[in-house]
Amino acid sequence: MPRRWILAATVAACLVTLTTRAATGTGPVTLVREAVDEGLVFVRTHAATLADEPACTRAFIERHYRELLDPTLAARFVAGPYWADAPPGARTRFTRALTDHLVAVYATAVSVFAPRIVEFARTGDIGYRLIRQDGRRAVVRVALRPQDRRDVDVDILLHRPGERWLVHDARVAGISLLAIFRQAFRPRLAREGLAGVSDALERHRHAGGGPPETAPCR
């Protein structure tokens, strides 16, 4: 995966989905802008220790990520056609396992790319534009303009099932983040269904590949 794509995904998608300003009445552009600002402040403040304190990143993600993302909608998208035939218990388990996996992925990304994110925050520029809003769905474009790299557009997909906006997905250069997970899990989903993927994700976590325990940042 190109470094430009990874950096863009980390700066925009992670920081948007890992922060929460989803108060009632907050519009989609304001939500995304404030979320990115809050996320950049967090990384800038703790950049020197994030790589050595995975529990700090985990705590940040746990505090914000689960509140802003709709885990069921994300799980349905990743599961694709295999969601419809799965029993309720399998759906619940898959949703929980996938969410834990995403937390681990985002925690690792924020820790690994913290220096690059700080560099971007210091020298780059970010623009925000509402691309589409139709009833309870909206797309906000985050234009990342690094000083010495090509510009990257990240589209944040939101929906409003109730009184506040939630992040559904993010597209970097037209590529959906959740679609990457769906593609990766598709062979096992076809063979073993949601239960098989849940087994694999849980084994990965118990083997040490999952997110660490939470702890306050120093």
Label each PLM-derived region with a short phrase.
Residues 83, 100-101, 146, 173-177:
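Solvent-exposed loop/turn segments at secondary-structure junctions
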Residues 18-24:
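Sec/Tat signal peptide C-region and signal peptidase I cleavage site
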Residues 174-218:
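Non-transmembrane domains of secretory- and envelope-associated proteins
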Residues 1-9:
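Bacterial N-terminal signal peptides that target proteins for export
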Residues 8-17:
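Bacterial N-terminal signal peptides
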Residues 93-152, 204-218:
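Surface-exposed, charged secondary-structure patches
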